[in-house]
Amino acid sequence: MTKEDNIEMQGIVIDTLPNTMFRVELENKHVITAHISGKMRKNYIRILTGDKVTIELTPYDLTKGRIIFRSR
């Protein structure tokens, strides 16, 4: 699967879960579980409840995603 196959969406973090997992509500009101991408983890980017984030989803499982950007 190539990078172009992934779906990018905007969302808001509504809950923090253990092991750097987050519950995110997307713009279309769906709630998914997301984890932090490796570069965000490496650079110690903090994500808190209420932050606007960009999520990358695969077409195979639309209930799990990866947080790739935190908006200011």
Curated annotation (Swiss-Prot):
Pfam families: eIF-1a (PF01176). Its main location: cytoplasm. InterPro entries: NA-bd_OB-fold (IPR012340), RNA-binding_domain_S1_IF1 (IPR006196), S1_domain (IPR003029), TIF_IF1 (IPR004368). This is Translation initiation factor IF-1. Component of the 30S ribosomal translation pre-initiation complex which assembles on the 30S ribosome in the order IF-2 and IF-3, IF-1 and N-formylmethionyl-tRNA(fMet); mRNA recruitment can occur at any time during PIC assembly. Keywords: Cytoplasm, Initiation factor, Protein biosynthesis, RNA-binding, rRNA-binding. Belongs to the IF-1 family. It comes from the Bacteria. Residues 1-72 form the S1-like domain. PANTHER family: TRANSLATION INITIATION FACTOR IF-1, CHLOROPLASTIC (PTHR33370:SF1). It is found in: Cytoplasm. The gene is infA. It comes from Buchnera aphidicola subsp. Schizaphis graminum (strain Sg). GO terms for cellular component: cytosol. GO terms for molecular function: ribosome binding; rRNA binding; translation initiation factor activity. The keyword Ion transport does not apply. NCBIfam families: infA. One of the essential components for the initiation of protein synthesis. Stabilizes the binding of IF-2 and IF-3 on the 30S subunit to which N-formylmethionyl-tRNA(fMet) subsequently binds. Helps modulate mRNA selection, yielding the 30S pre-initiation complex (PIC). Upon addition of the 50S ribosomal subunit IF-1, IF-2 and IF-3 are released leaving the mature 70S translation initiation complex.
